[in-house]
Amino acid sequence: MLASQVVSSVLEPSWFARPTCVVAADLIGKVLCRELTDSDGQQKILRMRISETEAYIGEGDAACHAHAGTRTPRTEIMYHIGGVFYVYLTYGIHHMLNLVSGPTESPEAVLIRAGFLIEGSARLMNEQLLDVNKQLNHIKQLAGPGKLTKGLQIDRTLYGKPITPASKVWVEDDGCQPLVSLRPRIGIDYARDAK
């Protein structure tokens, strides 16, 4: 079956209101979709297979931004019921894409760490084939949350928006069910045992 023939269903925001560790594991293999305008003015949808996530499970998680229970303008959206975006800037240059998960008043989210492009406009795919640095379908090209958001043109304008096609970023399920492995989280040495 060709990629264009695969039947996908859009995940509703309520899908993200489940336990965060379950959501993080279930997101592996799902398809993150991004609607953009191509350089020729045409609308396109990039589809990226999610290959790596990290769960941040609230006030008891030393690596979570809301671990101390302190609500700030930046973390306020994490207290929302699952199904909205939490995007923040780190090191002043990298946007981090998080999907708020779990119930209301429980500040939890799933960081999308890595993925690879599986479908996009033919024009974009052809441009990528000409320049190895632009090959978004290469397994390592969107490896790392900063590379991922840069490649998909995601920034803080997405903060607080629902995870739906109306936001121009959404998640689909096309039936892919890869094996999932659990590993320590990356880049949170400050959280010691919370890795």
Positions of PLM-derived features:
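Conserved, well-structured core segments that form or line functional sites
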Residues: L2-K195
